[in-house]
Structure formats: structure tokens, C-alpha cells
Amino acid sequence: MAIGWVIDHPAHARLFAPLMREMSNPNDVIIACDRIEVRSMIEQSDGFLPRRKTVWVPRPIGKNRFRKALKRYRISRKALKNIELVISVGAPIELRAAPKKSRRVYITDTEINHIAHKYSKPTDIVIPSHFEDKLSGNLLQKKAVIHRISGLHGHAHLQPRMRPNQVSNPPKILMRKLIGDGIHDDGEIVEFPDAWLNGLNIINANENQYSAHPWKLDEEISNCDGVITQSVTLASEAAILGVPALLISNAKRGFLTRLQKDGYPIFISNQADESTYAAWLAGLHLLDELDSIEWPDVKSELLYILKH
């Protein structure tokens, strides 16, 4: 069975990697969004992601987004002509461009991605058990089979790692700021004071500026004492790995609520407030007090859904 894998964001490449290693075949095609971090991951994917025919499509944002969307639709329609299964994470265009008889799987954990939800045309929708249905508009009213997975996307591709047994002096902190041009970034991005970085050893992983190997970002995170970021994806992955994450964002996600409820080390500030910052700094030194949290087998759950 020929499969189309839609990689619209670097996190999608990480999610797909263990799935492709299990079920991809040489007839598959990767539809990859032409953005710096996605291109970096595809070009340096040896040993991580199977090499497949890759078709590059534009990212439909900015002033000419409708023209870019149409161009992307045409490119994808041609590339997916003989594809039987299309798998997309929050990217709707390829689900419309896919053959009518194909199975079209739409994976999402982002409730407020309403534009993508609206234009997606799936046969199957895959959401996490903590997905806040009421925030997702009419997504779950579509004529599609609804599947629910028990954990976060990060549980599918991350692995528990050894952590430093003491905090560095100064603390080693990975920082990731976003450009803020994403389809649902408006209203979510919150700036934080430069003074918050004083006295910290900062590793720069800002969007489009990370210079280390893109597939080893999780190793970099695990080797740090903490993370400070505007990215909900990076914050959630750090928390899953047991690294105290300070997320400065107005974003509302079911998985953020889940992480807090389950006791993961994530600190969320939607106003860059000093109290949350102070709590995070204190949390850097409390790793010994973290309880062991169950690791859901999301990879197996996704493989079962995609194969049946």
C-alpha cells in the first residue's frame, strides 16, 4: 500500500519517524512543507527517517497565502495520484488533494487550529483522549471515524533519558523563541523580559536558528537543566522528558492541561509574570522529587489505527 506522509512542521517529522520505520515502503511519498526547519530535518534524516520520494510544497501563509495554497493543492494532487493512504498532522490541503477512494487520516492535538479543521476532508480523525472537544469547532461533526489515543504525540517518538544528577552552575537552559507567523500563532505569542536570561547558560534553539543536528534536539533538551520557550510543542516534549519547562504563551491546549494535571514539570505563564518564573527557577532543583509518570504506548496505538 502506497502511503503519502505530509510533513508540515518539524514535529511532524519526529512523530512520523518511528511510524515510517515500521510501516513505510519504497512506493511512499513525502509531501514536505518548504520551511527551513523541515528542510533541515529531511536533508539530515539518514538513520532517523526512511528515504522516500519527497515533493516540496509551499507554506500557505502571508499576503499570497491563497495563491500558495492553490499551488500546493495542484502539486500535492499530482504527487498523491496513486496513493492509497494519506496521513496528515493538522495539514488539510493534502486530504483534499488525495484520491477520492483513498483513506485520509487527519491527526491533530491542536483544538484551536480551526482553519485547518474546517478545510480538512478526512475519513479518519485521530485525537488524544485529553482533547478538549468544545474548543475544536465543528471538527468532530465531520463524517469520519474518530480515534482517540491515550497520550501526547511526544510519547510516540520520545524515549526516557538519563538526566543530569545535579544542576549546572550556571544552570544550562535551552531557549526557543518563535517567529510567530504560524496560522494560529496570532494572540498566543507572549514576549518575556531579557532579564529572565541573566545568570543562565543559554543554548539557542530559536525558530530557524538552531545550528545543531535537528534530529538530536531531544538529546539536547535532556542534557539541559531546564527549558524556556514560547513553543507549546517544545515545552510539552521537555516536560515529558522530565526537564522543567517554562512556557510563556497564551495558548490553550488540552495536552497542556493534561501535563499539569499529571504532575509533569511544566510552568505556564500567559503574562510573563515573575511568580511563575520564580517557581520554574525553583523547580530546576526539585527533580529528585518528581514522581515516576506512566508512559502511554502511543506509538503502538497509532500503528494499529493506521494499519486497520
Put a short name on every predicted segment.
Residues 34-35, 44-49, 53-60, 175-178, ...:
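Catalytic donor nucleotide-activated moiety binding site of glycosyltransferases and closely related
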Residues 84-85, 172, 225-226:
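Structural motif
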Residues 283-308:
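C-terminal amphipathic helix plus adjacent low-complexity
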Residues 71-80, 207-236, 240, 251:
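Donor nucleotide-activated moiety binding/catalytic core segment of transferases
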Residues 2, 169-173, 201:
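Charged active-site motifs of nucleotide-sugar-dependent glycosyltransferases
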Residues 123-187:
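A nucleotide-sugar donor-handling region in carbohydrate enzymes
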Residues 5-23, 33-140:
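Active-site and donor-binding regions of nucleotide-sugar-utilizing enzymes
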